[in-house]
């Protein structure tokens, strides 16, 4: 009897370990750039809190938006187990905000990566390009990662759509969808970001309900087995009333995978917040 129990326990542990290896925790986190006018919530006051939040939730990979080079340095200094892919949007180097992807360097290998600008034609390859009616240059950073534990590879893209330009959001979303379709090489796809759009707005529908049904993104929240946290993700450091907070931050997927949970993380220390956006995290299991 003891042998049977031990065998069953061993089998359960092996199955649990196998499931854990296949699972990947992915986060999207608009960290809010450095603005002195933010007062209590300016970066120098919340950077340790933001880094500790990342240490606590331990995403395997996470995409950031609005991160300046100094913020990238600060985040990396606090997370020695991670590396990142990405560049600043102003010059393709360290100038301007990043839409970078951080990853656990012991677990993942970068097979390919790049950054492009959300702009028309050849402008997409020119650092600092403005697209359509955008107020700022907008970028997308992507990578093909190989999970060293499972041998599985997947395509990950992270972005931040413009907050002003209606055409820029619409055309930017189309560009993102087309790029993911043409560059993912049939691999599972994860797309994270601040899309500056709510679920029924045009940019989200471009991604989830395109005319060409051969490649469609799915909102991970809509298929998650467990949904935790509020609907809204942008709170402006707590200044927006809870019920009126818009949902702007998403984790989209395409391919053979299941979503174990999707959570909007509302951590705060009274009036001090890790950012003006809530981080969003999802646990995904590739089949």
Task: Identify what each model region corresponds to.
Residues 1-23:
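Bacterial Sec-dependent N-terminal signal peptides
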Residues 18-78, 89-97, 174, 287:
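N-terminal, active-site-proximal structural segment of metallo-dependent hydrolase catalytic domains
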Residues 23-36, 99, 112-116, 152-162:
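Active-site-proximal beta-strand elements of phosphoester/diester hydrolases
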Residues 32, 68, 160-162, 195-198, ...:
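Catalytic metal-binding/acid-base residues of hydrolase active sites
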Residues 61-153:
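Structured beta-strand-rich core segments of catalytic domains in phosphoester-bond hydrolases
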Residues 63-65, 86-87, 190-194, 219-222:
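Active-site neighborhood of phospho(di)ester-bond hydrolases with catalytic His/Asp-centered motifs
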Residues 137-159, 166-206:
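His/acidic metal-ligating clusters that form di-metal
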Residues 167, 178-189, 197-287:
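Metal-dependent phosphoester-hydrolase catalytic domains
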């Amino acid at each position: 009897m003891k042998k049977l129990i031990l065998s069953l326990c061993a089998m359960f542990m092996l199955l649990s370990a196998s499931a854990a290896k296949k699972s990947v925790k992915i986060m999207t986190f608009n960290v809010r750039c450095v603005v002195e006018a933010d007062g209590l919530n300016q970066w120098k006051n919340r950077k340790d809190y933001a880094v500790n939040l990342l240490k606590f939730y331990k995403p395997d990979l996470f995409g950031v938006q609005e991160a300046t080079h100094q913020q990238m340095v600060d985040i990396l200094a606090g997370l020695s187990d991670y590396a990142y892919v990405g560049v600043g949007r102003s010059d393709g180097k360290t100038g301007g905000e990043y839409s970078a992807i951080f990853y656990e360097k012991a677990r993942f290998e970068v097979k390919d990566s790049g950054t492009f600008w959300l702009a028309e034609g050849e402008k997409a390859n020119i650092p600092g390009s403005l697209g359509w009616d955008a107020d700022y240059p907008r970028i997308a950073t992507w990578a093909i990662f190989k999970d060293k534990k499972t041998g599985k590879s997947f395509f990950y893209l992270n972005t931040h759509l413009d907050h002003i330009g209606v055409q820029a959001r619409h055309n930017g979303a189309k560009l993102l969808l087309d790029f993911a379709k043409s560059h993912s090489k049939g691999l599972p796809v994860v797309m994270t970001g601040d899309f500056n759009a709510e679920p029924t707005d045009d940019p989200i529908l471009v991604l989830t309900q395109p005319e060409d049904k051969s490649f469609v993104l799915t909102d991970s929240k809509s298929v998650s087995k467990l949904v935790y946290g509020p609907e809204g993700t942008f709170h402006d450091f707590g200044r927006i009333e809870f019920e009126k907070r818009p949902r702007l931050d998403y984790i989209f997927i395409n391919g053979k995978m299941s979503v174990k949970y999707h959570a909007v993380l509302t951590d705060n220390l009274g009036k001090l917040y890790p950012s003006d956006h809530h981080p969003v995290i999802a646990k995904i299991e590739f089949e």
